[in-house]
Amino acid sequence: MDMNADPRATKWTRREALSMLGMGAAAAALPRGASAVPSFPEGAVIRTILKDYPPEELGGGATLFHEHMSLAPDFLLRFRQYAADAQAVNRPPNAPQPAGQGGTVPPPDLSFMRDLGLLTEELAIAKREGIACIVDGGHADMGRDIGWLRQLSLSSGMPIVAGGGFYTQPFYPREIGTMSEEQVFQALMEQAQADPIGAFGEVGSWDYMTKDERKVFRAIGRAHLATNIPIFTHTGIPGKSALEQLDILEDVGVDPKHVVIGHLGNLVDPNTEVHRAICQRGAFVGFDRQGGPNDDPVVPIVMSLIDAGYADHLLFSSDFSNASALKRNNKELGYAKTLTVFVPKVKKAGASDEVLRQIMNDNPRRFLAFVPKVKRKV
């Protein structure tokens, strides 16, 4: 999960963020060609936890495609332990344990994700700063609570898209190992009918893909084909399984335009070979741990892709999971930090307002919009 540093050197004001997004009086100076306006299939919706929106109705601000507002209190403790165990497998004998791993450093406190008043305030601020919609990337095996997210959306006024699926091998329910692909597929269909799921995600691989993770990915691909619900993924750092994930989804018939391969800001490759391959195949590249100290090596990668003509395949978000980044604890951050901290760095590197508006406003709506195939059980 993300950590954060002081970003004040490039942080945008609320007015600057709203201007870039085409909101407020300052937006009049930012022309937008008709060819740049996204189009959506007839009957398409963005499914939020409270209702289905026509995608055009969420065009008044940025959409964050991967954040967290509902995780189990022990999620990061388990996350760190699994990471430490994975590193131990490849660690040379007698080598020191990496800093921050194991039981000596406590994980970030997630109790804020059970504080309705606090998160209501945080999301209301994010909305004022230009965020129109947020995708919660959790699901049951991460401790996501649908009822809690519904309360939070009602109290804050923020449209929230709920994720669905299964996370990664270490977090799978025990029965996944003995279930067939067909049984996993049926479980996903039950999720999609029982809950207002607007995306399958974050779903992924912990490191190199396991047999169970491949099985789950095939089932998720099939569930997408049966529902049209889009997919966003988690890749093991630094993106070892990115292309394999896309291969599996394509092999079962998924059109890549409905897929985001996530955490690719962690893949620091000046040649951007994997990033470009994903764009060329029609999927989105997710830079979704942004708005903090990991931004600097990511900005040149983003600019390389923009300069190569791939702006329409890029998505930004922050994978929010740290109380230190709350507005209450750091006035420079908050849930809008992708927009107010990372995006200004990309603009400073040479990206135009038009391109940034496309990435923050248009692309996520194009990704999330789908024509429902399955009627939900009410």
Walk through the language-model features, giving the residues of each:
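N-terminal secretory signal peptides
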Residues: 1-12
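N-terminal export leaders
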Residues: 12-30
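C-terminal segment of N-terminal export signals and the immediately downstream linker at the start
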Residues: 31-56
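Alpha-helical scaffold segments that flank or form the walls of functional sites
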Residues: 58, 65, 78-138, 142-158, ...
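Active-site gating loops and adjacent loop-to-helix segments of metal-dependent hydrolytic enzymes
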Residues: 68-114, 164-177, 181-182, 318-343
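Active-site gating/metal-coordination segments in enzymes
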Residues: 133, 151-155, 159-230, 281-284, ...
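Distinct, well-ordered alpha-helical segments
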Residues: 147-150, 174-175, 210-215, 238-253, ...
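Short acidic/histidine-rich active-site segments
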Residues: 232-234, 288-290, 310-332
